[in-house]
Amino acid sequence: MATHWLLLVYRIPREPTAGRVFVWRKLKQLGAIALQDAVWVLPQTPRTQEQFQWLAAEITELKGEAVLWQADQLYATDSDALRRQFMEPIEIEYRAILSDLKKKNRDLSALSKRYQETAARDFFASELGRQTRDKLLAAGGG
């Protein structure tokens, strides 16, 4: 299955630094991955496209420039490498949730919230995510 990608290319003034930090934090929150210094990628979905469009508008408000591209990966020595870059941190987060779910003093509400935040960045529907959801529901935290 071919994945279509969105690329956000931007330039933002160095000063004040708060704008640069805001954009970086937002990109991390969205689950975007940096391909180069100011080239970030997300799998294309209606939601991610809207999120990148909003961020591009915010970059413009910060006196920066932003261009949003739609792209297909035509060649790579390892065609699944980019997909794995998205999946690896997500699966680490799911494993941590599953580990915390086994603890006696677990906070199901907090674990459920962590699951929801992780699932929002799980662009490729990880099997571990499904298992985590099922175990949370069985524990009464879903």
Which residues does each predicted region cover?
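Positively charged, polar, low-complexity stretches
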Residues: M1-K103, Q116, A120, K135-A139
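C-terminal, charge/polar-rich interaction regions
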Residues: S109-G142
